[in-house]
Amino acid sequence: MFQNIPPITRNIIIINIVVYLVTNLFNTEFLYDILSGYYPFSPKFHSWQIITHMFMHARWDEAGIGPMHIIFNMLTLWSFGPALEQTLGEKRYVILYFLSGIGSYLLFNLWSFVEVQQYFAELQSVNVDVKNFMNSLINSPNNTYITHDAEKGLARIYYGKMLGASGAVFGVVAGFATLYPNAKLVFMFIPFPIKAKILLPIIIIASVFLGLGGNVGGIAHFAHVGGALVGFILASIWKKHLYRLN
């Protein structure tokens, strides 16, 4: 199954599958807590999560998504990764993949920071003592009394997990679309082929639109945007040095 997949793409897929099986078979919340990505000001944040969150995916018994989270990400990587890896070479491909994942984390949490400031302002407008609330939320979350929607939003940001390879995978898709803009892509849910150069702006615009509407269904849409932008920028820079594309 993996013999015809270039080594970096193959190893990334294998690592994701192994991590997924280990975290689900042992069903340990500890691994999800320390390896998933948290908001940088959350008490659950650790610096390594900027990388490790890329290898974590929704539990297989999680309502609404389950194993489709990792299946969709790995199928997408399997579809676009090999051509990009062969074109860029292993070193550049690794750089693009991980910088896209890091970019997705940074943009998502930058937007979270903006949301936090909005929630602070909203609570202050109704005379909530924000300092005391945040002190309770950070130091004693299980005993924090939450009544306001803005308080719920802050709890979601500070204790919500960011996980999945989606940001890095979106970077791979964006890189592919940048280097192969006229490649015709076929999807089950689209009755006609679509060129890669058309797909890229569609997914970015759609992700921005959905992100502004909130993380619908628990999906970190701005993470997708961050990954896609990094993939596009890197591929655009490197494209100038690639004299022959197959």
Which residues make up each language-model segment?
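A detector for small-residue-rich transmembrane helices and their helix-helix packing motifs
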Residues: 1-246
